[in-house]
Amino acid sequence: MPEELKPTMTQNFIHDFIDEDIAQGGQFQGMTVHTRFPPEPNGYLHIGHAKAIFVDFGTAEKYGGLCNLRMDDTNPTKEDVEYVEAIQEDIHWLGYDWGGRFFFASDYFEKMYEYAVELIKKGLAYVCELTPEQFKEYRGDVNTPARSPFRDRPIEESLDLFARMRAGEFPNGAMTLRAKIDLASGNFNMRDPVLYRINHMHHHRQGDKWCIYPMYDFAHPLEDALEGITHSLCSLAFEDHRPLYDWVIANCPVPARPRQIEFARLGINYTVMSKRKLRQLVEEGRVSGWDDPRMPTLCGLRRRGYTPRAIRNFSERNGVSKAASTVEYAFLEHCLREDLNETAQRRMAVLRPVRLIITNYPEGQSETFSVENNPNRPEDGAREVTFSRELYIEAEDFLPAPVPKYKRLYPDGPECRLKGAYVIKCTGYETDAAGNVTAILAEYDPDSRGGDPADGRKVKGATIHWVDAATAVDAEVRLYDNLFTDAEPDAGDKNFLDCLNPSSLEVLPHAKVEAGLAGAEAPASFQFLRQGYFCVDNKDSAPGHLVFNRSVNLKDSFKF
């Protein structure tokens, strides 16, 4: 990753553990720190995954180590090559690279099967014929262990049945392979957990070669060990699974002994990050797709105009801890606003246009003004914008009759500045038969070029933005808001669909933007003066049909 794009890695407890491992030597003596990011290719990555990516790849970078990308494709039910490709694109977009270390868990299926056979031979696994319903009954409760009637099945019989399971002789759910561990354990994950289940389903990579698939708790430690992972960084949800992780490593003849470390997931308010719920939003047409700019998916955030640096800084500033917490969505917006304020060039765009006619400006005449592109980056220079007798301004910048504290245009009201151009004063307006304002009339001060009257008088009205009507370009502008009205839409027994925000998208099809934006292409972002930060839509925008998405407004609602 380029140095200028790297966030500053703060100290966190994972680094403390790794420092301790290195200092103590032992199995980590002289070893390169080796991590992995192992998404399941059954959906698109979201902002929560961005934190895991940051932790996995960032930790490897900190220690000069390696980080693998591994597709955890052990469940063929919803996995697809579409997601495999999207995951790679998202990680590269964030600025990380796996350096050719790209693996699929399914490529280890044969080796995993061999390890399972070894466990059976050692008397540490057996084939169980309990149905899913019976399985729950035989798990017992906290105080009462429950024993499968198949637990003492002869080793040879389990070996035979397991081979026949692989051969496809039995239907889904007929049998499982279970580890033989501790029926009295207070950790239910250790009460003879399932290692393999039957699933007659086509696999996106292995085709129909397999009809038995390893459970995550069995596959995960084996994958880590086979790849030489030193530190397996997982979400806190797997803390209770660590004893099983260690049991698998200890009882299979694997080439490495990774250490699992758990950290808290990233939670954000006003959204959901369950893949199941995100898929439901897509499949029910509640959003336009996985890349809908209101979605927390990385492709959705990218389409909305979020930058890799903003997301990395957001992930880094939230830190890494064991304590689960929910972060304000406003903080994510703050990180984007902070980045775009520094990098985005300024432009003028009128979202709800009304004509402004400067009655004392010569007809047929025009001129240009030099306007700075970004006050924070002098190296970005300036651009020329045209000015003529007819302009477009925002409809909200005019009122037929004033209201208290209104500082913009109204008949015989105070003088106002046209941004970077002239001082004007409203003299009247025109309406259609229905009484709708169709044009605003004003006069300008020819001696106020640049916005400052030659006589030094104070301009009491506001400064408003504008676009030259003669050269303006048509555009569609989409204003996005939170997808949910509830800060915790999936908390408790809430139906998250009942919390959807009916006003999360407003489309303005008749916006006018300055001529210099005619050739704008994704992923370009701009600050539209007085409006917010906008990006060119990477899906619907095209020559002759510009589409801009509001990424974030100008006002920062986040409080430190």
Q: Which ranges hold each PLM region?
A:
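Active-site cores that bind ATP or allylic diphosphates and position pyrophosphate for catalysis
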Residues: 69, 73-75, 118-277, 336, ...
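Core subunits and conserved enzymes of cellular information-processing
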Residues: 238-242, 246-248, 312, 316-319, ...
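Long, charged, mostly alpha-helical binding arms that flank functional sites
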Residues: 256-335
